[in-house]
Amino acid sequence: MSENPATPSVLVISAHAADFVWRAGGAAALSAQRGSAVHVVCLSFGERGESQGLWKQEGMTLERVKQTRREQASAAAEVLGASIEFLDLGDYPLRVDDAAQDRIVSIMRERRPDVLLTHVANDPYNRDHNLAHETTLLTRMVAQAHGHDRSTTPLGAAQVLQFEPHQPEVCGFAPDLLLDISPVFDLKVKAMRAMSGAQGHLVQYYTDLGVRRGVQAVRNGAPKTVTHAEAYQRTFPTVGEELR
């Protein structure tokens, strides 16, 4: 956990190599600019199911797609100010075995995040996202267990924020946080463009979504200077000393 409450450390668990950019790029950039440590774990490259643009290129191979996705996601993370690693677990379907779970637990204990960002629990369009959500909760639980690996320190009560899915209306997504990302939206756009070779059609979609969520943030009490926002749903209660 961060020693400074003003700069909570952030760990992002992303099912595919681009998910963190579209859905949490603003949060990552904002946190990094404020001095927080931000680390991204990509469970897969999204090489089979989320690299449409690359597969349209003549002579493309699976290994070339994976390498390209690694390069693109690494470039995007650099723009956002985050570090990144890839577990290469495959996609469509994603499979997380015991060794991968142990690795994620180790990352959590090493990184000691105050906040975890990941997918929603139920995305009927993409079951890889569901597994990423369940894996995040499972490994968080294990990382908190005092009897697990006594050579490392147990994780504290890190909040899990679920970022907005592509089809929120059918995923049961009920946001309770609209995060103002206006100061870093240009960085999010730059990071999204780094991924555009595989999924270029999503750049405009998530640009428009940022504007819509910004309008909703103002409607819900944010200053009128807010132009862009990202939506999140908390998994656990927040703790406070006042009603607000």
PLM ranges: what are they?
Residues 1-13, 34, 83, 93-244:
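Metal-dependent de-N-acetylase/amidase catalytic core
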Residues 1-111, 241-242:
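Active-site rim/loop-helix segments in enzyme catalytic domains that contact anionic ligands
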